[in-house]
């Protein structure tokens, strides 16, 4: 038997095992997708004004035939809330998975960068100083805009420092922790000078809620996720190589620092847009 035949015989079990692994993953993905669809339908059906499955399907296919009250409940309340939960969960889930991969730490999350605390600081400033009027922004968007700006600003600081001092795991984590403590101190200072009404609004915002969801906000969060997902898929191989260690990834030609900075930028964008519209959630 030739050497090629020996290699083929040795590789056959590996190929079979890999196919089984991929099949199991696909089965799990299909099952989870079906569970998500079922949970969404049940969520839309459930509430003080309950809908049957037939009413939900008919309302989705023929919205003009619904009574005004039923139309508002289905299309303006329950569907935006349900879809916002899906797209925000997708953004935070993908962001968390990428953070854990590039930092090689199963405990890493978008909060590691201080993005959520920065968003809270931006929202607190908008609430306490009533920045909607002087800037001419719609009142429903002023808090999300400042929350997003704060989150992006904190991410920019982390990215700049990481680029200057090297985007190693220790560098990113230490800068993130330092930024978190600084932001927490500023948030507490804002809360100290806030009046009772503003303080109540800040507390409710930090608790997170889907009740602020609208179709426009769902579209914005969904668009950011749709832009980030293909970029994540393109870098799957490089991130998988990075799980074996930086030296291992570099031996395969992966630019580790550039990959880590790219992922951190993507994670920051997804986290910022999700937190801006729902508050500190997840």
List each language-model region with its residue ranges.
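Alpha-helical transmembrane segments in inner-membrane proteins
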Residues: 2-282
């Amino acid at each position: 038997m030739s050497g090629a035949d020996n290699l083929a015989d040795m590789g056959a079990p590996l190929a079979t095992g890999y196919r089984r692994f991929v099949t199991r993953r696909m089965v799990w993905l299909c099952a989870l997708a079906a569970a998500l669809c079922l949970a969404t339908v049940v969520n839309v059906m459930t509430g003080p004004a309950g809908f049957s499955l037939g009413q939900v399907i008919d309302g989705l296919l023929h919205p003009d035939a619904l009574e005004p009250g039923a139309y508002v409940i289905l299309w303006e309340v329950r569907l935006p809330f349900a879809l916002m939960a899906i797209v925000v969960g997708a953004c935070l889930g993908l962001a968390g998975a990428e953070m854990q991969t590039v930092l090689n730490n199963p405990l890493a999350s978008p909060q590691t960068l201080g993005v959520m605390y920065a968003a809270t600081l931006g929202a607190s400033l908008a609430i306490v100083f009533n920045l909607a009027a002087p800037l001419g922004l719609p009142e429903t968007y002023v808090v999300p805009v400042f929350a997003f700006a704060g989150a992006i600003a904190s991410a920019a600081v982390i990215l700049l420092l990481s680029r200057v001092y090297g985007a190693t795991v220790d560098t990113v984590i230490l800068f993130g922790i330092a930024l978190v403590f600084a932001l927490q101190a500023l948030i507490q200072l804002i809360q100290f000078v806030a009046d009772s009404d503003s303080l109540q609004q800040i507390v409710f915002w930090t608790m997170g809620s889907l009740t602020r969801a609208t179709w426009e906000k769902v579209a914005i969060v969904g668009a950011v996720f749709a832009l980030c997902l293909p970029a994540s898929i393109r870098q799957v191989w490089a991130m998988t190589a990075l799980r074996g260690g930086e030296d291992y990834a570099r031996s395969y030609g992966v630019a580790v620092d550039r990959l880590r900075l790219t992922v951190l930028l993507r994670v920051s964008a997804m986290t910022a847009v999700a937190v801006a519209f729902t508050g500190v959630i997840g």
